[in-house]
Design a protein with these regions (language model features):
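Enzyme catalytic cores with a strong preference for nitrogen-chemistry domains
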Residues: 1-346
Length: 346
């Protein structure tokens, strides 16, 4: 469970962590553990202790030099790219609650539209967070498609989180939906990595007999999504990740090599006033570097941001901050991304 790895302590120094791209998270984590533990050698009587410690300093100095060169090289490359896609990330700062009545649904839609501030004449991809439509399913939202049609134009595309149901199998999913302004589904991604006791109960049938249920609404568990596939909007090749899927490097390593942007939607209200939203955000920085891709993150009561392919935060909204941020995302040529952690296992 890669949440508090030692390597995440470097998230503030993007030059150092550029090495994630060629060697991967777990190899870098092993080197970081060795480095942070290396001062212990000074408690031993050895004539090699200064030499060994100097080797570790030299390794991380070389990481810094490599990272600085890569960042400058990528900056020059990005400056020459003419083709961009306009994206808006919205952070509504909604309280964590379930909506049920038509009145509550309409109020929620109107608020998210206001924060989106759509320009009818400009092609835009809007990204809304997970959890804003908690308590309803996509079919319930479809009843209000007339509001979406009036609020957004044909030049607008929407990405948001909502629960969905497969009526043929009676399975329920935590999904990311991509739609037009009529709420016609263009793409649907069902979350693969579910949160234990939050989205599913292990040994569900047995647990129900003892009255155990999720900490979220209801007894039933969500079903796991079957596959992870990129989708393309306005020439932008997008990899979708829902909530804490962002902490798993494997999900980005085996994605489409031509990924231009990772989209991460999240409900961070669970963390409350803790360090959780900041820890959650740090993982997104690492994924952007490993994947050599831009990353757009929309988090309710978390950190919403645009991160470039070097892990630099271009724009951000803090936890409990409402509004939107916008960026012309360049269609970078993704020549190389970390595909695995073979170096770690070697």
């Amino acid at each position: 469970f890669p949440w508090n790895l030692w390597s995440y302590s470097w998230s503030w120094l993007v030059e150092i962590i550029q090495v994630l791209n060629p060697i991967g998270l777990y190899a870098f984590n092993s080197i970081s553990i060795a480095f942070f533990c290396s001062p212990v050698i000074f408690f031993f009587k050895s004539k090699y202790k200064y030499f060994v410690f100097s080797i570790f300093l030299l390794i991380f100095f070389s990481f810094y030099i490599f990272g600085s060169y890569k960042i400058n090289d990528d900056r020059d490359m990005t400056r020459d790219i003419k083709k961009t896609v306009y994206v808006k990330v919205i952070s509504p700062n909604f309280d964590m609650r379930y909506i049920h009545t038509d009145k509550e649904i309409k109020e929620t839609i109107k608020k998210i539209v206001r924060y989106s501030d759509p320009d009818p004449n400009r092609e835009t991809i809007f990204i809304w967070p997970e959890g804003i439509f908690a308590g309803i399913y996509f079919e319930d939202l479809k009843k209000f498609s007339n509001i979406f049609n009036k609020s957004f134009s044909k030049k607008h595309l929407l990405i948001f989180g909502i629960n969905t149901q497969d009526k043929s199998s009676n399975e329920f999913y935590n999904s990311l939906i991509t739609s037009n302004n009529n709420l016609d589904v263009l793409y649907k991604y069902d979350k693969k990595k579910l949160v234990p006791f939050g989205e599913f109960i292990p040994f569900n049938d047995l647990s129900e007999k003892f009255g155990l249920k999720k900490i979220t609404q209801g007894y039933g568990s969500f079903s796991k999504g079957n596959e992870q596939k990129n989708f393309i909007l306005n020439e932008l090749n997008i990899l979708p990740l829902i909530c804490y899927e962002i902490i798993f490097p494997k999900l980005t390593q085996f994605s489409d090599k031509k990924t231009n942007m990772i989209v991460n939607i999240s409900e961070d209200a669970w963390f409350g006033n803790s360090i959780g939203p900041h820890q959650h955000f740090a993982k997104a920085i690492f994924r952007s570097i490993e994947n050599n891709s831009y990353l757009a993150r929309s988090a309710n009561k978390g950190i919403s941001a645009f991160i470039n392919n070097n892990g630099k935060t271009i724009k951000r909204l803090e936890p409990h901050e409402s509004g939107n941020i916008e960026l012309d995302v360049p269609l970078i040529n993704n020549n190389f991304k970390n595909k695995n952690d073979l170096i770690f296992f070697v």
